[in-house]
């Protein structure tokens, strides 16, 4: 990146207005190859002429593309010619992929420069403990106990490509680049809509950039509506849908309500609304009444249909009551458990009973989802019955055992925060018996005979690491008792989800 820094240091007035000429600079293609494709897709590069090139950068194919872009008539090729000449069709599909990657790199330049200017002179404090996934659950345990409802919204897509082009138009002021981008999408892509699940495999950087810009556009408007939620019942928010004058209308809207309605600013505004985006979903936790939650639901429906022109069925917005329904988040099923508590109180000669309800945060393991992930990876069948791992029988005994022990410890480490360990013990049982069946299959023996010979050694391998961790946290007398069955342990060294946990 430092090698090309001199090429990218143009003044602030030009960096947003003249991105189109960068498509005709060879060094940008080198930058895209080194910084993008070599990192995201190491096994396959669209800047390589063929496999005999030993995956080296080809300047010849870049020169051909630039020459075609200068000669606009040569860049436009009828669809009939693509079918008649498969070599030409493949080449133009390759050109389209190159342009899409390059567009993502070029448009990221003003975003990265503006982000760097915003953090210039500021010191960002780093807390490695807060990087752990488990650090979120103490926050949920503290906050969710005060909430009643959770709004679970599935972010709708596919979305029409023209909406994405208009979204980029608000941030990239170069009309030539946007016209060229639209031309490439409709000329070579021939798509009617945008579906990241189907197309992200072809070009991850490009489609992730489009998806993130789409989400950024949505959240920028939603956060404004959330801050001004006290006015939504009386004022239609369709007036904000033209984003060219969006910020001016925000300022005008704020002045009108501050001057004319100062007493109603906090009537319907919810200060306890928490928002998170996870796995293509929006999750809103609040202490509102069912009536206000239904209002938020219809606001979401109208918002997506009016602004993004996407049909959004009401079934994709679920209102869950935390005391009855579970919130699926980061591999756990979280809910609130109401524990009735009876307290006997006595004043002088009179005694009476007081009924209290204690709200407790409950985190459970989604056993059906985990068994589905185990069945998908051939550790068991769909009913949860362990089977042998046939693809691992060619490995050594120690390698097979270490693989199972490592998976078992990681899952046990991640799900140590569950309220009840019954489902965790079931997962361990599946992995242990799968390990035994795999080793027995390798040695062409029965499970019973193999356990008689090496059963104690297998149990020691599976249990030693877990006992060492627990002995550092609790005294021996405590973790050997039944109380450990109900203790939740949150670790601060978990930075990513295991594949079996990340089942969605």
UniProtKB/Swiss-Prot annotation:
One of its GO terms (molecular function) is RNA binding. Keywords: Chloroplast, mRNA processing, Plastid, RNA-binding, tRNA processing. InterPro entries: Domain_X, Maturase_MatK, Maturase_MatK_N. Its main location: plastid. It is found in: Plastid, Chloroplast. GO terms for cellular component: chloroplast. Coiled coil: none annotated. Pfam families: Intron_maturas2, MatK_N. GO terms for biological process: mRNA processing; RNA splicing; tRNA processing. Usually encoded in the trnK tRNA gene intron. Probably assists in splicing its own and other chloroplast group II introns. HAMAP family: MatK. Belongs to the intron maturase 2 family. MatK subfamily. This is Maturase K.
